[in-house]
Amino acid sequence: MNFLIIGGDDRLLYLAKMLLDDGNTVKCYALDMAKLPEGAQHTERLDNADCVILPLPAEGKTAGTLNAPFSAKSHSIYEILSSFEQGSLVCGGKLSPKLREAAEKKNLRLRDYMMRPEFTVGNAAVTAEGAVSLLADNLKSTLFGSSVLVIGYGRIGRLLAHKLRGLDAETYVLSRNSESRALAESMGLHAVSPTADNAVFSAFDAVINTAPAMVIPSMEALKKSCLLLELASAPGGIDRERAEQLGLRCIAAPGLPGRYAPISAAGLIHEAIRNILREEKHE
């Protein structure tokens, strides 16, 4: 099969290697400053391919531009989409509604690999492991015996809380959802309500947020040595400006898999794309 990889970070470079190892042909566009794996080809042309692969996220910090940190210039993602023939298969991650609309007008088969269960579950596991590593590197004490609050009890929050408990950290879970709090307690974790007394929050050595909205009732209650770790995408759930005013250390770490374990993250994209291809009858 012929693949065209467009933009992206280390994850898509490792993905290119995996696709080559499968016996495919791989061309790379908007990766002009990257060292490609042996066998991959740089291209300046947006040629048609059996499968076009966009990065995760597909768009850069400026809406409408391609996420292409290894390219010397900016690229319009809409111009890129418009260059492909109708019916072309295009796979990308975290695709915006506007991007979907543009693909639909062009009659492209746009597929979001980030939305697939095999990706989301694996990505949560990699994120949780990366968060534990980041926490261990930045805490001024061992995880053993530390009091850690995990905000949110979704896929990432659940895996993270149980990894921390396995390392003998005193692990607390804050959730607005009473069922999630009950589930956390049934699994041997401490559950905290957003309406809990401020004194509860004064004991934490670290607070890790996985929720998209701000739910820390009172940052003033946290002790000065408390480490804040933000895993949610912008705007996140931690008021970083307020944290700075209070003298609290805050580390923003969205997209952790791409930084902590790009090979594992590439493997998840690889698996998702192979499954998409099977469903699209390309394999």
Features from the language model and the residues they span:
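N-terminal glycine-/charge-rich "phosphate-binding" loop or analogous flexible N-terminal tail
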Residues: 3-43
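Glycine-rich adenosine-cofactor-binding loop
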Residues: 3-14, 19, 144-164
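Residues in the short beta-alpha loop(s) of Rossmann-like NAD(P)-binding domains
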Residues: 9, 30-32, 96, 176-177, ...
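NAD(P)-binding Rossmann-fold cofactor-contacting core
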Residues: 22-37, 167-187
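Structural motif
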Residues: 50-51, 89, 147, 205-206, ...
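Glycine/serine-rich phosphate-binding loop and adjoining beta1-alpha1 elements at the start
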Residues: 54-144, 253, 272
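Rossmann-like adenosine-cofactor binding region
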Residues: 57-59, 73-84, 184-258
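Rossmann-fold NAD(P)-binding glycine/threonine-rich loop
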Residues: 94-111, 232-277
